[in-house]
Amino acid sequence: MKTKLIFLALLVSMCSSPAQESEDIKIISLSTTHTEIIQSLEAQDTLIAVDAFSEVDFPVERIDAYTVTAEELAPLNPDMVIVAFDFNGIVEGLESQEINYVLLPPAKNFEDVYSQISTIGEIVNKKGAASSKVRDMKLEINRILDDANYENVSVYHEIGYSYGIYSVNSDSLIGEIYNALGIVNIANSEEDPFGSGYPA
């Protein structure tokens, strides 16, 4: 059980070991998740800046994704900015500055994960690596789900942020994992007025 949950926790973070390879495209990632996907595809050389919480082991400029403006990003001359949340009007600003961007909100299910990996693969010219990763993930997830036996198991998953404490329901990726495993998520009964998947 512990091994299975560790793998699925890694799926949530989508983290993998980086390697070296040069690419011409210059990317700013304002999303920890997508920084990790880029590294897992061995395309970290495309990164010229990342958000403050991304885990990288190479020198790169750090940016506060919550407060940064498009005007502050423009001098870095990125070819692409990856955005997970439209904080501080960043999307409108990027459009005003004519900076290419892609908005990839937090994945709510497995298919979102696969789709976003494929999208990142296209951006960094690693479509083959992305396809292989998605295939391997599907095989491993199916193996885990086939072996899963969590009858009469319930869970409450709490996430703490600087701006409040939240749980997760079935409209989130974490909640999707619990549902797939047959684990009862007690937060599914909590009110989620915005349909975010993260009821307070």
Task: Please provide the spans of the model-predicted regions.
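Extracytoplasmic substrate-binding proteins
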Residues: 20-26, 90-166, 187-189, 194-195
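A short, structured surface patch at a secondary-structure boundary
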Residues: 25-88, 99, 183-186
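Sec-dependent N-terminal signal peptides
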Residues: 4-14
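Stable alpha-helical elements in mature extracytoplasmic
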Residues: 33-37, 43, 69, 86, ...
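Residue-level recognition of alpha-helix boundary/capping or hinge positions
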Residues: 17-22, 73
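Alpha-helical, coiled-coil/dimerization segments enriched in small aliphatic residues
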Residues: 49-60, 166-199
